[in-house]
C-alpha cells in the first residue's frame, strides 16, 4: 500500500513523500522521499567539443569559473540534504546536468559524498548539452 504527499520546496523542486507498508505480518511502515529538480545548467568549466557549452566557460559571458562551479555543487548538495530532513531522499531526479563529470563531482566531491548516492544519466541529443540524471 503506497500513499504520498506532494509539496513544493524552494524554487523549482518537487518532492514526494511516499508511505507504505511491507507485506508482512508486522505491517511495518516504510517512508521515503522522491525529488525532481531542474537545477538549471549544472556545467563544469571545461569545453566539451560535442556540446554547445561555450556560455559556461571561464572566458565566456557568464564568467563560469571553478569557484562558482564548486559553490553551485555545494548549494545543490545543501538543498538536497535539507529536503531530506533527517532522512535523505531515496531518489533525486535532476534536470539540466552537463555530463558525467558534474555528477561525479556532485556525488563524490561535495557534501553529498556522505550520503553515498550513485547515479544514472541520459545522453540526450540536446544541442546545449544538458542531460537528466537520477541519484539513488
Stretches found by the model and what they are:
Residues 1-18:
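Bacterial Sec-dependent N-terminal signal peptides
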Residues 13-132:
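N-terminal, active-site-proximal structural segment of metallo-dependent hydrolase catalytic domains
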Amino acid at each position: 500500500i503506497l500513499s504520498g504527499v506532494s509539496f513544493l520546496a524552494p524554487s523549482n523542486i518537487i518532492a514526494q513523500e511516499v508511505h507504505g507498508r511491507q507485506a508482512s505480518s508486522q505491517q511495518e511502515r516504510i517512508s521515503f522521499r522522491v525529488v525532481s529538480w531542474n537545477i538549471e545548467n549544472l556545467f563544469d568549466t571545461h569545453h566539451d567539443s560535442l556540446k554547445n557549452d561555450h556560455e559556461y566557460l571561464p572566458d565566456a559571458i557568464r564568467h563560469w569559473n571553478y569557484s562558482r562551479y564548486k559553490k553551485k555543487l555545494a548549494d545543490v548538495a545543501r538543498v538536497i540534504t535539507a529536503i531530506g530532513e533527517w532522512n535523505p531522499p531515496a531518489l533525486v531526479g535532476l534536470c539540466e546536468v552537463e555530463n558525467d563529470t558534474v555528477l561525479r563531482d556532485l556525488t563524490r566531491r561535495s557534501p553529498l559524498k556522505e550520503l553515498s548516492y550513485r547515479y544514472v544519466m541520459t545522453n540526450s541529443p540536446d544541442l546545449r548539452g544538458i542531460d537528466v540524471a537520477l541519484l539513488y
